[in-house]
Structures are given as C-alpha cells and as structure tokens.
Amino acid sequence: MPKLQSPMSNSNVFCPFRRKNVALTPEEYVRQNFLRQLVEQHHYPASLIAVEKALPPIQQTSGNTHRKRADAIVYSSSMLPLMIIEFKADSVPLTRKTLDQIAVYNTQLNVPYLVLHNGRETVIARVQDSQITFLDQLPEWNQLSH
C-alpha cells in the first residue's frame, strides 16, 4: 500500500478496501494510515476489512429507524465480525461520546474488540461478557479469536 501524504484540499486517494478514489479528508487520512498499519504491521488480511460498512437499521424509541455506517469492520476468516473501528480526524479528541457511538454499533454486531483512533491516540477495548477491558496495544491478527 502506498504511503499517504498529508491531506490537502481537493485531493483524492485510492482506497484499496473500497476499490475506488475517495476525498482525502483529515479523517480519511487517519483511516488509510491506520488500516495500512493493520495490514502491514499487525498482519490483518486486507480482504477481511470492510470500510464504511452499512449496519442494520437501528430502531429508535421514537419508532423511527436510523441507518448508520461503521468506519471499518474487521472480519474473521469465516466472515464473523471481530472488530469495529471508529476514526476521527486528528483534530477531534476521543471522548466518552465517541466510545458510546461505537458501543451502540456493537449492540448490533457484538464484536469482541472496539477501536477508536484519531491519528494521535488510540483506544482499544476488549468486550467480553458485557465487560469492557481497555488494552495497551492492538492485538496481532493471530491473537484475535477467529
């Protein structure tokens, strides 16, 4: 995967996961660099990473349905979701609200790993039996339960 340059206005980048050119926004810059790291350094198969993946509709208390997209989902070799990743631009802090957002996605997917990343910091959580444990480092591909 080619190394990305810093985002500039009116720039596009080829996303190998979506197989198309996309606008190189600050969030996209963070996304592409982190996903490249997953593949190159942590040995995650690129073919098992879905980007901007539509989630099943969420039924809200008002009765309306709300459609969401996960920034990235890592799947097992048997196509079970293992990890949800939420990206923010490097100027956006990771907050409890960001964690709550990804936790809502996880009510639908029930994955064992949640990751938040903004280019400067990464929050990695292991979810097991409704308990969240924060991890110091990203698990290698061969450490995931798959």
Descriptions of predicted regions:
Residues 1-113, 120-146:
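A short, conserved, highly charged catalytic patch centered on acidic carboxylates
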